């Protein structure tokens, strides 16, 4: 089922990652092609509604996937990555396949992108998505009191802003933050700390997973340990706040793999995320810290 209205269509040909595949270790061009094929299979398998509008901008859309007989189910709100400048829910709908099969309602959310909009607009949209889900997800068999927010890369940043700050009044039970830049000051996008979630923690869900590759190569020439350090930074900030969490380190996983691992039953990330989403484990286990992160910290001047 598809909602009516003027919505942004998925076209990876406009993406930098698609236009410059040789610049990347990760195979983003191949990922986008495979993702739409997998999405078609998910659409055949599960009840779904596409291009639901939660705002007036063409970017403000979300897709919902679920098993047909789902009732009072846990809910996953998933924010895609793309450096806040590219991406579309359609390229991540296939992640719903595993989660809907296990009984969750999967919401794949879009949001306004740079440079036409600001990162602050992206964050505001993440809050708006969450509010929409709370008000409407029961009609899709979801339980609004069992929401986990999840996201990869810039989507992980958005998920963290929703789950860890009290700017969003919605109660969140879980967070799965994957390979996210959390200190925007280091990226030159924002001079303030207001959009850096590790500096803005004012609440923490009951169950939290932070994951990242070690190392995690993406664009050639970039620091393959940057996201490793950022992930460990968020984990350390949560511990300092007094939170319990699971840290999942994915050795030698590129930036595509750290995204797809979320729905891969063979990945340790899937098992940790399953416990967050379904609440099927109350044991909090923190994985060993990345040795690379410790080395980098020791090399930094005071």
UniProtKB/Swiss-Prot annotation:
Q: Which reaction does it catalyse?
A: N-octanoylanthranilate + H2O = anthranilate + octanoate + H(+)
GO terms (molecular function) for this protein are: hydrolase activity
The Basic and acidic residues compositionally biased stretches are 282-302
Q: What induces it?
A: Up-regulated by PQS.
Keyword flag Hydrolase: yes
> Record's SUPFAM superfamilies?
alpha/beta-Hydrolases
Give the record's keywords alphabetically: Hydrolase, Plasmid
What EC number(s) has UniProt assigned to this enzyme? 3.5.1.-
- Residue segments, region Disordered: 280-302
Does the keyword field hold Hydrolase? yes
Cross-referenced PANTHER family: AB HYDROLASE SUPERFAMILY PROTEIN C4A8.06C, KYNURENINE FORMAMIDASE
Protein family: Belongs to the AB hydrolase superfamily.
Function according to Swiss-Prot or TrEMBL: Involved in the degradation of the Pseudomonas aeruginosa quorum sensing signal molecules HHQ (2-heptyl-4-quinolone) and PQS (2-heptyl-3-hydroxy-4-quinolone) to anthranilic acid. Probably catalyzes the hydrolysis of N-octanoylanthranilic acid to anthranilic acid.
- What is the protein named? Probable N-octanoylanthranilate hydrolase AqdA1
Species per Swiss-Prot/TrEMBL record: Rhodococcus erythropolis (Arthrobacter picolinophilus)
């Amino acid at each position: 089922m598809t909602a009516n209205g003027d919505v942004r269509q998925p076209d990876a040909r406009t993406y930098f990652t698609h236009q410059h595949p040789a610049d990347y270790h990760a195979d983003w061009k191949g990922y986008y092609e495979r993702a739409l094929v997998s999405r078609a299979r998910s659409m055949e398998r599960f009840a779904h509604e596409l291009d639901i509008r939660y705002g007036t901008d063409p970017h403000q859309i979300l897709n919902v996937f679920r098993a047909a007989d789902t009732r009072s189910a846990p809910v996953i709100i998933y924010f895609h990555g793309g450096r806040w400048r590219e991406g579309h829910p359609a390229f991540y709908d296939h992640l719903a396949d595993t989660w809907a099969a296990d009984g969750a309602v999967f919401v794949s959310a879009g949001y306004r992108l740079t440079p036409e909009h600001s990162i602050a607009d992206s964050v505001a949209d993440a809050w708006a998505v969450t509010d929409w889900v709370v008000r409407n997800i029961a009609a899709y068999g979801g339980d609004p009191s069992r929401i986990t927010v999840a996201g990869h890369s810039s989507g992980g940043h958005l998920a963290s802003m929703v789950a860890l700050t009290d700017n969003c009044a919605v109660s969140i039970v879980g967070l799965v933050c994957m390979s996210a830049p959390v200190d925007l000051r280091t990226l030159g996008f924002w001079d303030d700390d207001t959009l850096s979630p590790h500096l803005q923690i004012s609440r923490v869900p009951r169950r939290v997973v932070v994951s990242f590759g070690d190392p995690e190569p993406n664009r050639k020439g970039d620091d393959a340990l940057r996201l490793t350090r950022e992930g460990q930074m968020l984990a350390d900030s949560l511990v300092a706040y007094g939170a319990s969490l699971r840290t999942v380190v994915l050795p030698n996983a590129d930036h595509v793999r750290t995204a797809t691992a979320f729905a891969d039953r063979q990945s340790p990330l899937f098992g940790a995320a399953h416990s967050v989403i379904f609440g099927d484990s109350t044991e909090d286990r923190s994985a060993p810290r990345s040795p690379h992160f410790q080395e980098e910290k020791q090399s930094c001047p005071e």
